[in-house]
Amino acid sequence: MNNSTNSSNNGLAITSPYKTFEVVFIVLVAGSLSLVTIIGNILVMVSIKVNRHLQTVNNYFLFSLACADLIIGVFSMNLYTLYTVIGYWPLGPVVCDLWLALDYVVSNASVMNLLIISFDRYFCVTKPLTYPVKRTTKMAGMMIAAAWVLSFILWAPAILFWQFIVGVRTVEDGECYIQFFSNAAVTFGTAIAAFYLPVIIMTVLYWHISRASKSRIKKEKKEPVANQDPVSPSLVQGRIVKPNNNNMPGGDGGLEHNKIQNGKAPRDGGTENCVQGEEKESSNDSTSVSAVASNMRDDEITQDENTVSTSLGHSKDDNSRQTCIKIVTKTQKGDACTPTSTTVELVGSSGQNGDEKQNIVARKIVKMTKQPAKKKPPPSREKKVTRTILAILLAFIITWAPYNVMVLINTFCAPCIPNTVWTIGYWLCYINSTINPACYALCNATFKKTFKHLLMCHYKNIGATR
């Protein structure tokens, strides 16, 4: 807080600069905003907790952002309201420094979370083959923890111990502001680092995100889903290993049959050489396969996803070898960056050469992936995630820009900004914490429905709300 209400030397003889009805109005408005902020962000946190469809990596970042906004609603808003209506700081220097440290740490954590959300979406869109492999809950937790720890290191020590570093406390009794903000160069530098630089980075990232998303949606619209080849020319990477002469049981005497099992794919006895799919992430709603050779035991293989097993029967005299390929696909689970997998197993005879074998595998993969391609989620899901990020980014810029512009002006001309304008600008930064939950609800129907169920106490099946 760069300027404060002037106080006398004892700081206790000051009366409020506002009239009684103005004080009542300020308290009512500020109290209402605080209450809405608290309720809204609690709804966000509870919704993510109880609704499994909201438990995605992207929403874990929103959960962290909601935690920061909740702290602002509980502490920062109410203490600043007290400071404003009374006209001086009545709680002493220790509480003042603790409040300022908490205020700036959580505010900076909000900015850091916004940066994380922007980078996460950017990598999802621009690196769909590699980034989702690294995009785990553990990684998200580490990034969130880093945002909070970095924010604490940047602000808390400087705010709490600056008076001891310089050897004197220059903040007068009855006032509460960050002491090192009296230095114009420091004020200018912190404004650049805390607002202008993050805004520039997030704006550039969003521009790339929007461009990539529009390009993808445009491409999908040009290609009718019914006529699309669900498998790209580079789908099968690497050659299928040629069958060897290991003796093992054959099929069912030339018959062709399909087996679809949920969870387990039983194997016949004997040694099997299997080409197992290497999980390689693809872009949203697409399928990719990468084959690598591995030996597998003849026991049951349990998977999280459905296992589809296709066997081509041969005469019992043929030496055969089992070949399997894992198809890694992407499902839309809210953040458009979640991989799933399906395993295709083929048994071929030793009489087939490598090219024929690979052609059979490719045809089977086409057959497997054709049906999911018809059920491809509409481009609106892609737009939903991008729209949410845009709403959060715009809310952040609109609410934080006035105060940070005033900070730069104050560096060169302190008397140019009236006290009331400072107060409004500072409050706008707080209002960002009130707006964020509304952004989630307006841009995400699942959040909106879950909020409604919670507010109306409809808890039945709330965990499955889409």
From Swiss-Prot:
Phosphothreonine sites (modified residues): T446, T450, T465
Keyword Amino-acid biosynthesis on entry: no
Transmembrane regions: 23-45, 60-80, 98-119, 140-162, 185-209, 388-410, 419-442
Species classification: Eukaryota, Metazoa, Chordata, Craniata, Vertebrata
PROSITE patterns for this protein: G_PROTEIN_RECEP_F1_1 (PS00237), G_PROTEIN_RECEP_F1_2 (PS50262)
Residue positions with a glycan: N2, N3, N6
Subunit structure: Interacts with ARRB1 and ARRB2. Interacts with RACK1; the interaction regulates CHRM2 internalization.
Positions where Phosphoserine occurs in the chain: S232
Function summary: The muscarinic acetylcholine receptor mediates various cellular responses, including inhibition of adenylate cyclase, breakdown of phosphoinositides and modulation of potassium channels through the action of G proteins. Primary transducing effect is adenylate cyclase inhibition. Signaling promotes phospholipase C activity, leading to the release of inositol trisphosphate (IP3); this then triggers calcium ion release into the cytosol.
Originating species: Mus musculus
Listed Basic and acidic residues bias regions: 254-270
Location of this chain's protein in the cell: Cell membrane; Postsynaptic cell membrane
Annotated GO biological process: G protein-coupled acetylcholine receptor signaling pathway; presynaptic modulation of chemical synaptic transmission; regulation of heart contraction; response to virus
Name used for this protein in its record: Muscarinic acetylcholine receptor M2
InterPro entries to which the protein is assigned, alphabetical: GPCR_Rhodpsn, GPCR_Rhodpsn_7TM, Musac_Ach_M2_rcpt, Musac_Ach_rcpt
Membrane topology category: Multi-pass membrane protein
Post-translational modification: Phosphorylated in response to agonist treatment.
Cystine crosslinks: C96-C176, C413-C416
Cytoplasmic side: 46-59, 120-139, 210-387, 443-466
Stretches for region Disordered: 218-320
Sequence ranges on the Extracellular membrane side: 1-22, 81-97, 163-184, 411-418
Motif Important for signaling per record, residues: 120-122, 436-440
One Gene Ontology term of the molecular function aspect: G protein-coupled acetylcholine receptor activity
Gene behind the chain: Chrm2
One of the record's GO cellular component terms: Golgi apparatus
